[in-house]
Every structure is written in structure tokens, then in C-alpha cells.
Curated annotation (Swiss-Prot):
Cofactor: Zn(2+)
Name of the protein this chain belongs to: Small ribosomal subunit protein uS14B
Keyword check for Ribosomal protein: yes
UniProtKB keywords: Metal-binding, Ribonucleoprotein, Ribosomal protein, RNA-binding, rRNA-binding, Zinc
Organism of provenance: Kineococcus radiotolerans (strain ATCC BAA-149 / DSM 14245 / SRS30216)
Cofactor note text: Binds 1 zinc ion per subunit.
Family, per entry: Belongs to the universal ribosomal protein uS14 family. Zinc-binding uS14 subfamily.
Subunit and partners: Part of the 30S ribosomal subunit. Contacts proteins S3 and S10.
Gene Ontology MF: a single term: rRNA binding
InterPro entries per UniProt: Ribosomal_uS14 (IPR001209), Ribosomal_uS14_bact (IPR023053), Ribosomal_uS14_CS (IPR018271), Ribosomal_uS14_sf (IPR043140)
């Protein structure tokens, strides 16, 4: 889990736009965040396997 201070810091509007970054809405992870879902890759995978993300299916070819 992310530190509470870092989550609150990320929620504030940055002084410069380029300093802003995405965080996972579920766990607060700052890396590998899918913009479409607002979740990190780990949370997307867990929620997709549990069937909590509508329209997401496991691919097979």
C-alpha cells in the first residue's frame, strides 16, 4: 500500500501540469496505471478474474 502522505500529495493540484501523475484508485500504486480504468495492472487483473470489470474478457487465440 502507498503511504498516506504520498496519496494526499498526489491528490493536490501540482504547481506545474507536467508534475501530475496517475495513481491507482484502489491501492494507490503510482506505476502501470491504466487510464481507462484508473487502476494499476495488478488491480485490473484481480478485478477482471473476479468478473468485476464489465466488458473485460480473458483473451485466447
Amino acid at each position: 500500500m502507498a503511504k498516506t502522505a504520498l496519496i494526499t500529495k498526489a491528490a493536490r493540484k501540482p504547481k506545474f501540469k507536467v508534475r501530475g501523475y496517475t495513481r491507482c484508485q484502489r491501492c494507490g500504486r503510482p506505476h502501470a496505471v491504466f487510464r481507462k480504468f484508473g487502476l494499476c495492472r495488478i488491480c485490473v487483473r484481480e478485478m477482471a478474474h473476479a468478473g468485476e470489470l464489465p466488458g473485460v474478457t480473458k483473451s485466447s487465440w
